[in-house]
Design a protein with these regions (language model features):
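Nucleotidyltransferase catalytic core that binds NTPs
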Residues: 1-148
Length: 148
């Protein structure tokens, strides 16, 4: 959310695009993720949400976007994002990939960490936006691993 807020200050229009990856099964459907993103971004009038399948470069071409913005928390993020940015550059030279370092307060926050906390019955509400925190917490209940 921090990267989205900062992007909204930097750009006239921001599209938060959710990849529909049929190879992955997430806690929430793409439609549910879009719904939650819309609520989280409701106070940012220049932010809209969308979803896509396939290559990011194809989506960027189709929507005529000029920039792909990626948030980075660590060197490990850079190590995985940089090769993808290079491939996207080869597929679509007219689009730029920009990297925005995460706010230090969010360096340890990731969807994997939130999933781990939720699966073990921990309180995820401090780590997700308040307007969706209860919904996210409830979604973990059927998957929780009992703690001793």
């Amino acid at each position: 959310l921090d990267v989205i807020r900062r992007a909204a200050r930097l750009f006239d229009q921001v599209v938060v695009a959710v990849l529909h990856n049929p190879a992955k099964t997430g806690l929430f459907s793409v439609e549910k993720r879009l719904d939650m993103l819309r609520r989280v971004c409701a106070q940012m009038p220049n932010v809209r949400t969308d979803s896509f399948e396939g290559l990011l470069a194809d989506y960027v071409r189709k929507t005529d976007a000029a920039v792909v913005l990626r948030g980075l928390r660590s060197e490990a993020d850079f190590q995985s994002e940089f090769p993808m940015a290079q491939l996207n550059r080869q597929l679509l030279p007219q689009a730029e990939t920009l990297f925005l370092p995460a706010d230090p307060a969010h360096l340890c926050l990731s969807s994997s960490a939130v999933r781990e906390i939720g699966r073990f019955g921990g309180d995820v509400t401090p780590f997700v936006p308040s307007c969706i925190s209860q919904e996210v917490a409830e979604a973990f209940q059927p998957y929780q691993i009992r703690r001793n």
